[in-house]
Every structure is written in structure tokens, then in C-alpha cells.
Amino acid sequence: MGPLKLNTANLSQIVAAGAGRVKVPTYRRGPALKEGIVHVGVGGFHRAHLAVYVDQLMQNHGVTDYAICGVGLQPFDSAMRDALSSQDNLYTVIERSAKGSFANVIGSINSYLFAPDDREAVIAKMAHPDTRIVSLTITESGYYYNENTHELQSEHPDIQFDLDPANEKTPRTTFGFLYAALARRHQQEEWFHHPSHARVFRPSPHPEVAQWITDKGAFPNAMVDRITPQTSPADKESLANTMGIEDSWPVVTEPFMQWVIEDQFSDGRPPFEKVGVQVVKDVHAVEEFEKHKLRLLNGSHSAIGYPGQMAGFNYVHEVLENPDFNKFVWQMMQEEVKPSLPEIPGVDIDQYCKTLMERFSNPTIMDQLPRICLNASGKIPQFIMPSIAEAIWVKGPLRRLCFVAAAWFRYINGVDDQGNTFTVDDPMREELQAKARAGGTKPSELLSITSLFGDDLRNDKRFMQEITNAMEDIARDGILKTLPKYID
């Protein structure tokens, strides 16, 4: 018998064919569930993270009023709409590790709305009384947030479009949809919650709505973590051949999963603690967890991704199989990033770093370097530059961090050390590449983009010397020959 198409009718057969390696939802779905969560951005990470936690609450704790309505805002989200609709909004999460592969069919996404087809339906769903949480998984650029000023990029054409009262019913951005729903809730004088930053609504064309959001909205900070590579055709084929499931768009991920969230909700929340979520009262605790994750995990991903792709590697684990890269990443974490991080009660930073290296080295999830390198202009200012800034402030070591920044500056040109071209997928690609061409092996042109780097870095002689040296060495000798200079 061939693989079974994933849908509600086939679940019992899928379990039988899975020989103990496949779990499926046994709770009632559809009208039996109340959709208390609207989630914008149903990609791989959401389906491997929040949707899994909610599925566990439904499966193991009888929660029925926080099913998820997924929302796609962009034209490319039609692919997810079609995949989910063809299989009753079910999908498979494949966990891979050295111990083997296990599959969980997830049923927590109960419906899906595609905004380009019906924007009003999305606004109405967000504003519906059953909706108690609106959550987001969007890229860094989708936040329209300036890391240097810590404000909304209010001059961006998309934001300007959404600020025009004439366009309230046809928003372009996530925040335009949220504002339209909040304004409707304001009219109804009902409470509303969404996890974002209240400050992004301050440019509102209706001050009374902005004040209502400030008074009655809740905006919990959160830290999320689970490595989730892009799904490949080989992943689909493997699922069909080994577990007998034909899934249009499964998710491959690691066993590790973490979520730390501030306990600040205006209209109730699910009992997240029951499924391992760390719910904390202190917003500063969340911020400290987030700083650890951004600078150690994401910063190390940057140290693997840009130099690794320039050196000709394809996957994260392949980079760390190189002894020089392995030492470099570990030493950068220990000597240049860790000293800037706050201590968190109950968290052993050294053990956290060791766990990260183990996770990065997992060969079974085949984590692609292009995924790591995507949208770097929204990542480097968060993942690498803050550690550099703090090292400058305390006169600490920073040469490895400068090597990573220099590798990205070379990466921007779209040519690796072997002369092979690749696509630089970044919303600022044209400006970045123009600056990179103008600057050559000097960093000044790229560092003049103050929206990414601010004004201070160019004035620090030590930083400028370190990054210039790294850029010149990489240009002359390539990544692999330069790397040993940065290892003790």
C-alpha cells in the first residue's frame, strides 16, 4: 500500500501504518473548537512552535477555546493556504535527532484566511469576540522597526499607506491589519490583546484609539527558540516512504523547543505552563532570555552562515564539522559574547553554549545556510552589532565579531570564495550592494548606513582597524585561509 494522503478521514490508518512513530490528534476539531488565537505568518517556525504547544494543550489537557486561525498577508502565502486546505488544515511535524525520526500530526490550526482574497475577513476575525490573542511570526523587515532609534519606520511607504485613514479597510502591513481590528474593537468597547510593542501604534490617525490601545491592550514580551529548516522535496519523500504519510508541506525540526513569555494578557490565556512554557511575571527576565538567545544562538548562526556560505558549505552541520570553524564559533561565544550577557538564575551559560553547539551539529535536520543568511540587514544589527558595541564600551575583545561582520560585508557582493554567484535575499539588497561595490575592502561605505549601524561605530579606531583588517584578509586569502588567524 502506498502513502496515505493526510486528512481527517485517514488519521486512524496513518497511526496504524506508523508503527508507533506517528501521533495524531484525537480531539474533535472544526466547529467543536473555539478559535481564540489568530496567528499572522503561518510558516515553518509557527507550525513547529506555537501551534505545537497549542496542539499539546488540546490533546493532553482538554483545552478547546484557543484553536488557531492562521492568516497569510502576502501573495506568496497562497501556497500555504492551498497546502493546508487540501488536508483539512492538518500537517506533520517531523522531529529528527541522533535517536531517530518521529512524526506528530498537528491539528491546532482550525482554519486559514488569505488576506489578498478578503482583507475584511481578516480584520473581522481579529476583531471577533472569540479572538483573545493575535500572535505574529514575521521577518525582521516586516516589523518596520529601526534598531537604532527604537521606533517604527513611520516614513516607510507601506506605513504611510496604512496611516492614511482612506486606506483603513485595505491595509498593507501587519500593523495596519492590527490597527483596523483594534479600532473596530474600540468601537465595540471590548478588550483586545496582541503580542507586539504598543509604541508602533502611536502614530495612529485617531489619538483616542491609540490611547485606548495603551490603556486596555496587553503586549507581553517573549523569547522563542526552535531550529526549523526549510522543508525540502526530500523531506516530503522521506515522510511518505518511512512513515506512510503524503503531506503537501510537512515541517522538519529538532527535539529542542523553548518559549519564555511575560504573563501579561488582557483577556485571559491558555494554561501554557502545562506544556512546558516558561511564563514569567518580570518583563526583564524575558528580555534577559531574549538577549541570551539573540546574541548566542542567532549571533552564532551568523558566524556560521555568512562565512560558511562564502567558504562553499551548504549546511550548518557541515560548517561545524570543520575544526577551525568549530573552534571559532565556540571561542566567539565564550570570549566575546558571553561577557556582555546578564546572569539568569538557574541558567548555566556554559552549558547553554554547549547545547547550542550540539544543536548546530545535528546532521539529521539539514539546516540550510541560505535560510540562516536570509534578510541579514534585519539580523546583523540585532545579532552581532550589540555585542560589538558592548565590547567597545568595556574595551573587551571583538576581533571574531568583526570577522563575522566583515564576512557579511563580503557576502553582500553575492560571490563566494570559489567565484560562484548566489542570490542575496535581502530587502536592502540594492543599497547594500551599491555600498559594497563603492567601498571595496574598506567598511566605511557600508557603515555609513546609519539606519543599520548608527553613527558611533565609525568613530572607534579599534573597531575600524579590526573590521578593515578582516575585510582585507578575506578579500585576499578567502575565508578558510583567514579563519586560523582568529583562533587561539
Curated annotation (Swiss-Prot):
GO terms for molecular function: mannitol 2-dehydrogenase activity; mannitol dehydrogenase activity. It comes from the Eukaryota. InterPro entries: 6-PGluconate_DH-like_C_sf (IPR008927), 6PGD_dom2 (IPR013328), Mannitol_DH (IPR000669), Mannitol_DH/Oxidoreductase (IPR050988), Mannitol_DH_C (IPR013118), Mannitol_DH_N (IPR013131), NAD(P)-bd_dom_sf (IPR036291). It is an enzyme of class 1 (oxidoreductase). NAD(+) binds at residues 37-48. Keywords: NAD, Oxidoreductase. Monomer. PANTHER family: MANNITOL DEHYDROGENASE 2-RELATED, MANNITOL DEHYDROGENASE DSF1-RELATED. Belongs to the mannitol dehydrogenase family. This is Mannitol 2-dehydrogenase. It comes from Aspergillus niger (strain ATCC MYA-4892 / CBS 513.88 / FGSC A1513).
